[in-house]
Amino acid sequence: MSHISRQAYADMFGPTVGDRVRLADTALWVEVEKDFTIYGEEVKFGGGKVIRDGMGQGQMLAAEAMDLVLTNALIIDHWGIVKADIGIKHGRIAVIGKAGNPDVQPGVNVPVGPGTEVIAAEGKIVTAGGVDSHIHFICPQQVDEALNSGVTTFIGGGTGPATGTNATTCTPGPWYLARMLQAADSLPINIGLLGKGNASRPDALREQIAAGAVGLKLHEDWGSTPAAIDCCLGVAEEMDIQVAIHTDTLNESGCIEDTLAAIGDRTIHTFHTEGAGGGHAPDIIRAAGQANVLPSSTNPTLPYTINTVDEHLDMLMVCHHLDPSIAEDVAFAESRIRRETIAAEDILHDMGAFAMTSSDSQAMGRVGEVVLRTWQVAHQMKLRRGPLAPDTPYSDNFRVKRYIAKYTINPALTHGIGHEVGSVEVGKLADLVLWSPAFFAVKPALVLKGGMIVTAPMGDINGSIPTPQPVHYRPMFGALGAARHATRMTFLPQAAMDRGLAEELNLRSLIGVVNGCRRVRKPDMVHNTLQPLIEVDAQTYQVRADGELLVCEPASELPLAQRYFLF
């Protein structure tokens, strides 16, 4: 029997069981838990390699073979960190297993035929496309920035750079919902729209859901009163959609206790639950300990650094239409920015009390940094808090699974789309991101949308090969023409499907129906289920979770930063 060194094997086919991989320049390492390969039967494409006619490629017709195979990929997902070949058929993940030619190779369940394309993923990491659940649709160019960062699904609201959209994630009313659904039909990213949830009577909310809103957003700038909260959640329970909330910073219509009383035991997604992005001052963070509250963060406070507080004051004045010459407006801004709660937020993420991360795109958040900042928090918390049980000093698999769930499966489950997107699992849309380990979470090697490459770094178009400088991200064929419609999904509620809204608006994209929103609870948040008793000192803003004081120093240096962004 022939032998090969572990290093030579990893160089040729990627890491296998027991090998460890560093994630970019972070302090995080993953260890391969399982390898679906049969040693000696690995498939690889190229001159003199395995995937050739009669060898690793069989004779089957297209109906029996994969449309696309990613070979020897290191999959990092909430369910595991494994090495496998990934088979894609009709734009969906068909098989995770062993690729090759079943006529001559044993154990093949990912058949390769003459109709199969190949992406060489050996030495690469594959993750699910990110789900950003806090999008202000201020400009369509956000889609390019998000795709280039590894995000493939948007949940949010807006109508463009209108004053209301600059501040709130709402697409208000049937007319605007129709126009935004039609506009989204040509954007190469999955989209679900949130309507405006601020109403004390239900009819105007019901008509927005029937018009295509997959959720409703309660925002203090429209008046997040107990009456509006109760009414909105009542309609959500009736029509199985999610409610997201930005609570009352000024405590005008009530305090955190009043909001929690209005919510009752009904499921709700609390945006920027720390509070710098808005919410009851100073203690909205307490909501993260409730069983029915699904808490998320927006990325400007992630992680806590020496620059976080100063940056936030200016952002807030612009986004919420405040006037620095008005003392009350300045006081409003300053009440939201608290070092103590921002520092506690990182720790609560590491404990699994905060379940999701998101952007707050162009409205106190950066649409292209959801993935990057999530992993910066994970790195920073490893330095501050050490390994998370059951991790060891040598691998961080559990912490990695906890953090990747925050921007993939958990927002998908929260908004009732987890059956379509949010993980690398059979049956789901093939929205996949390939990373070189050295560039993990910073710059994808390529992004697949519905099984087709939608964006990738590309060199000089007049070059003799694809790699000469200048290399930058460019739209690929999956972003063009009718291919967009075959590889992207618009999400609609059942009420809109029942009235035939997709046909009425002549939507050409795939349609996904949200469901199960009202059943999701904190224990359903994958790897992020903790429900601590959170207390905030009203004078000092110190935060305690189950009696433990949550404090950490701001970071002065981070990974995934200037080393990767010289220009």
UniProtKB/Swiss-Prot annotation:
It catalyses: urea + 2 H2O + H(+) = hydrogencarbonate + 2 NH4(+). GO terms for molecular function: nickel cation binding; urease activity. One of its GO terms (biological process) is urea catabolic process. The modification N6-carboxylysine is found at residue 217. The keyword Nucleotidyltransferase does not apply. Coiled coil: none annotated. Ni(2+) 2 binds at residues 217, 246, 272. Residues 129-567 form the Urease domain. PROSITE patterns: UREASE_1, UREASE_2, UREASE_3. The active site is at 320 (proton donor). Pfam families: Amidohydro_1 (PF01979), Urease_alpha (PF00449). Ni(2+) 1 binds at residues 134, 136, 217, 360. Keywords: Cytoplasm, Hydrolase, Metal-binding, Nickel. It is found in: Cytoplasm. Its EC number is 3.5.1.5. Pathway: Nitrogen metabolism; urea degradation; CO(2) and NH(3) from urea (urease route): step 1/1. The keyword Repeat does not apply. Substrate binds at residue 219. GO terms for cellular component: cytoplasm. Carboxylation allows a single lysine to coordinate two nickel ions. Binds 2 nickel ions per subunit. Belongs to the metallo-dependent hydrolases superfamily. Urease alpha subunit family. NCBIfam families: PRK13206.1, PRK13207.1, urease_alph. HAMAP family: Urease_alpha. This is Urease subunit alpha. It comes from Pseudomonas putida (strain ATCC 47054 / DSM 6125 / CFBP 8728 / NCIMB 11950 / KT2440).
